[in-house]
Amino acid sequence: MKILVISSNLIGDTILSTGVINYFTNKYPETKFTFVIGPSAKSIFKNFKSVETIISVSKKRYNMHWLDIISNCYGKKWDIIIDFRSSLLSYFLKHKQKFIFKKKSNLNHVQQLSNYFKFDCSDLFIETNTEEEEIVTKHLSDDFKYFVIFPGGNWKPKIWSIKNYNSLLIKILSQNKNIKFILVGSKSEEENYLNEITKNIDSNKIINLFGASLTQTAAYMKKSKLFIGNDSGLSHMASATKLKSIVLFGPTNDVIYGPFMQDSQVIRTNESYDYFKSINIDKTKSYMDSISVEKIYFTLQKNNYCE
């Protein structure tokens, strides 16, 4: 069986769709998948054993990238086409069955998928390889608990202050000597945040994973205790690796993109998402100031995340 998946360009949405892929993999174990996907998200499937082809497509002017996609997929007989981008591509290709998913508002994204496909889409996954797992084993110790920290993001308004992250880490360490922090994100986020988030913190308490691949990051998450970070693709990766999480929300929609995993928590600003929709957002400033360090630390204690 051959399945064509037209995936999102976004890392987060791609990760949230893996429950669908998981279902079809289990139902049809011999299936070979072809993924049409953006360059930033393509590595999510690099270790996926059922992948046949990954077609990486970058956006072009006047939507000319769709011609590239058609040329790569045309002339083949697809058993199933799964389109997460609500495109017209399937109408140009031979297929036996198709699913064209369109996002809606005011319902968790994974629940939207489950409602559309009429099966449980919550079993997310991201596969890691032996080399990635051996690196984790080499660097992590059973003597410590590891918190994954993501202080960055692709949109300034939803990024909590790096000074607050630093204060939170210091507060956690003051009461918990057996915790270490794994800092994740891109190389540019390393340049922007590393020095300030680690200020006055013993370097032995920090594992700098900025710039690591998505799958290497996932391998570390699989061996960690907790994720704390801004609304992002990496917060969804925490769900895919079954890592409990505390995700911070302000001018983004926690109803749709909040973690659905049991024992994970949403902490949002005093202002609701509807409030942020009603104002003009200044893209150069953060709107997360009403979330206090104390509020997050209280959530840690209340849910026994440090134990």
Positions of the model-derived regions?
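Catalytic machinery of carbohydrate-active enzymes
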Residues: 1-307
